[in-house]
């Protein structure tokens, strides 16, 4: 069974949902970078103070800082882990791969949750968030495509990627993922 897994997919594809379901059923660590950053801030750690300061200035948290927080969580005792929504670009993927090899926890599998754009837009509009207008959603999806397509190719070249049809019900998707993890 694969134990070091990454989930990729557009906003609203169901990465977080599937990552959480799979991590719970296997007692794996589920690492979502957004949650990790919030947790560091909440716990008022040295890294959290740095992150809070950067965010308060309206700046993006650097790749180096995010990677440091991810690494710190990966080296903790775990039966396995699932990364959700990170890396987001080639530079982050290369850095992450270096760290994973250093800590002897190489990436074993990448699930790409594939979903038609129109289905994705409908899903995101149904979430009912104030900032989720069709225009802003399409912009986010376009940005995602531009940055993620090279990432998908990168993992494809490493023979790590598995495509998952994310336009199905939750149980069917989870079952498909579990089969591919075996």
Curated annotation (Swiss-Prot):
GO-annotated biological processes: AMP salvage
One MF annotation (Gene Ontology) recorded for this entry: ATP binding
InterPro entries: Adenylat/UMP-CMP_kin (IPR000850), Adenylat_kinase_CS (IPR033690), P-loop_NTPase (IPR027417)
Reactions accelerated catalytically: AMP + ATP = 2 ADP
Gene Ontology CC: cytoplasm
Region (NMP): 32-61
Region (LID): 126-132
Presence of the UniProt keyword Nucleotide-binding in the record: yes
Main location: cytoplasm
PROSITE patterns cross-referenced by the UniProt entry: ADENYLATE_KINASE
SUPFAM superfamilies membership: P-loop containing nucleoside triphosphate hydrolases
Pfam annotation, one family: ADK
Pathway, per record: Purine metabolism; AMP biosynthesis via salvage pathway; AMP from ADP: step 1/1
Binding locations of AMP: 33, 38, 59-61, 85-88, 92, 129, 140
Localization in the cell: Cytoplasm
Keyword Ligase: no
Binding site for ATP: 12-17, 127, 168
The protein's role, per its UniProt record: Catalyzes the reversible transfer of the terminal phosphate group between ATP and AMP. Plays an important role in cellular energy homeostasis and in adenine nucleotide metabolism.
UniProt record similarity statement: Belongs to the adenylate kinase family.
PANTHER family in the record: NUCLEOTIDE KINASE (PTHR23359)
NCBIfam families: PRK00279.1-3, PRK14527.1, PRK14531.1
The protein's assembly and partners: Monomer.
Domains (record comment): Consists of three domains, a large central CORE domain and two small peripheral domains, NMPbind and LID, which undergo movements during catalysis. The LID domain closes over the site of phosphoryl transfer upon ATP binding. Assembling and dissambling the active center during each catalytic cycle provides an effective means to prevent ATP hydrolysis.
Name the UniProt record assigns to this protein: Adenylate kinase
Protein source organism: Prochlorococcus marinus (strain MIT 9301)
Source species taxonomy: Bacteria, Bacillati, Cyanobacteriota, Cyanophyceae, Synechococcales
UniProt gene name: adk
